[in-house]
Amino acid sequence: QLRAIGLAPGDAVMIHAALRSAGQILGGPDALIDALHDVLGPGGTILVYTDWSDDYHDLLDDDGTVPAELRDDIPPFDPAASRARRANGAIAELVRTRPGARRSANPGASCAAVGGRAGWFTADHALDYGYGEHSPFAKLVQVRGKVLMLGAPLDAMSLLHHAEHLAKIPGKRIVRTEVPILVEGRTVWRRFEEFDT
């Protein structure tokens, strides 16, 4: 069925899946990822939008800053260990934890990938404007990659954030927030900039 919808060896495919809406998949999510690997072959790449489970956003003040007294209680983003955001589904976390998976370093726009070009897709992901020109999303467009929406609604397509970033719209709002990231084994609070989406 995956070949019938146009997937082919060597393709780069970003998948968004809502498994409850997709219906029964024999073998579950692992079987789906294995089937994608079979179709794409060793040169193909599977990508997912992971984001991360950053439950502290309700604590931000109007300036996008976390109160100093709470900082020690908030774990930093670690590309190797931080879970994918739960709202992004089981497939995102499954791909993130697969053997050989790579993950990009931008907390809010992070992607994980497995396959032939996983390292290239996830390398050099800018910390500011994470949906922009040097993102896994831009690289997916560059290689004419595909997006597989499996039971997920169209508004879940993270590639739309890349289009929003590129759109020449006057007065686009810039959001600045502090984010804890792991740098050489210690937590560093860094202010990030992103277009509001």
Ranges and model annotations:
Residues Q1-T197:
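N-terminal and secondary-structure boundary signal
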